[in-house]
Amino acid sequence: MKVTLPEFERAGVLVVGDVMLDRYWYGPTSRISPEAPVPVVKVENIEERPGGAANVAMNIASLGATSRLVGLTGIDDAARALSQALANVNVKCDFVSVPTHPTITKLRVLSRNQQLIRLDFEEGFSGVDPQPMHERIQQALGSIGALVLSDYAKGALTSVQTMIRLAREAGVPVLIDPKGTDFERYRGATLLTPNLSEFEAVVGKCQDEAQIVERGMKLIAEFELSALLVTRSEQGMTLLQPGRPPLHMPTQAQEVYDVTGAGDTVIGVLAATLASGNTLEEACYFANAAAGVVVGKLGTSTVSPVELENAVRGRAETGFGVMSEEELKQAVAAARKRGEKVVMTNGVFDILHAGHVSYLANARKLGDRLIVAVNSDASTKRLKGETRPVNPLEQRMIVLGALEAVDWVVSFEEDTPQRLIAGILPDLLVKGGDYKPEQIAGSEEVWANGGEVLVLNFEDGCSTTNIIKKIQKDSDK
């Protein structure tokens, strides 16, 4: 099975926030200045890129979505350069011009890929009337699927609560990249996307993932958020939602050259994916993949649909992730040549919970590679009843593929995976629950091939059925 990219061309997103122009001066250094002990850079190339909220808008446009941008600028060369650069990449700008302030500009001088100095030209836009921005938001709400508020604490978002209210009244989700420790101003947002440092500045230093989850859930309740996504650099991302188990996604970055603008890419891909009609879990999956691409580039950058598709499918192409049965057989054959022990399990995994995550982690510890075979939607309906699955096959496989413990995810149409297991013949077949080994589908074939069959315990108190009942009970209140 191939993971399908969102239909970005259907998506419309409005970005509102602090726009800025990033200027880069490049050149070699060969001597020290006689005036002061600093290197002399012979500038040979100048580059100008949209930054801040403008970079978010550019990331959205690069995916093929309709991207609109509202922000504050001066009336100067930097504003004109910013407008032209954005027009060149199909971002529709509707700036509010403030004649008393300069456009925020950041100048970086680089030599041999090393940044020597950064010069900031800004005064902030404090005291500027927010009403023109409110009017622009109101005009756009009927044609967008998501609103992004990109906060760099430069003055464009002094009336965040009004902006959130306007969007929520129109049924438009609000995604916010926060700044500072005053999260009260973001009350009622659909999704906040702080990085770990920003998150810990509000909740305190976290010792482990469990503490991140505990404090994050309290934050969600305190500020009436629909969800919280904590981006954790080399540790990946953690998505928290009320009534759902946490979703931890490992980083997909291969090499990290520059984290500048990575947060802009994450929230841009999140918004474009949600506006395309995908779920939040799917949006996080694609955003995580995009972040892995953009940190491998120098400076503020964007991700194209081709790059995103390659990143999403890269795990399958290199022997990991969601794949077809034939691709899995090839991946297993390659693993065996490397002397790796292959473990296999199966299930519906309809609403992934802590018990599933713990079980899969324990299964993975028993070998070098873990295969998870997943019942198709039709198979699940026959097994669990007409109301199941809650989540369709592609979504279930995407979430499983994002787990660090899982190497390969494959689907099967039959009531049991016996045929699939007979074709793969894992070294170890595991199943959770109170089964006897001889009752497990595929056990005879695995034993006949010299493999092992093992039953693992599930974590007490964790059940998809119980979660569904609780959600139904809460919705009836």
From Swiss-Prot:
The active site is at D264. Catalyzes the ADP transfer from ATP to D-glycero-beta-D-manno-heptose 1-phosphate, yielding ADP-D-glycero-beta-D-manno-heptose. This is Bifunctional protein HldE. Pathway: Nucleotide-sugar biosynthesis; ADP-L-glycero-beta-D-manno-heptose biosynthesis; ADP-L-glycero-beta-D-manno-heptose from D-glycero-beta-D-manno-heptose 7-phosphate: step 1/4; Nucleotide-sugar biosynthesis; ADP-L-glycero-beta-D-manno-heptose biosynthesis; ADP-L-glycero-beta-D-manno-heptose from D-glycero-beta-D-manno-heptose 7-phosphate: step 3/4. It comes from the Bacteria. ATP binds at N195, L196, S197, E198. It catalyses: D-glycero-beta-D-manno-heptose 7-phosphate + ATP = D-glycero-beta-D-manno-heptose 1,7-bisphosphate + ADP + H(+); D-glycero-beta-D-manno-heptose 1-phosphate + ATP + H(+) = ADP-D-glycero-beta-D-manno-heptose + diphosphate. Its EC number is 2.7.1.167, 2.7.7.70. Pfam families: CTP_transf_like, PfkB. Keywords: ATP-binding, Carbohydrate metabolism, Kinase, Multifunctional enzyme, Nucleotide-binding, Nucleotidyltransferase, Transferase. In the N-terminal section; belongs to the carbohydrate kinase PfkB family. One of its GO terms (molecular function) is phosphotransferase activity, alcohol group as acceptor. It comes from Klebsiella pneumoniae subsp. pneumoniae (strain ATCC 700721 / MGH 78578). InterPro entries: Bifunc_HldE, Carboh/pur_kinase_PfkB_CS, Cyt_trans-like, PfkB_dom, RfaE_dom_I, RfaE_dom_II, Ribokinase-like, Rossmann-like_a/b/a_fold. GO terms for biological process: ADP-L-glycero-beta-D-manno-heptose biosynthetic process.
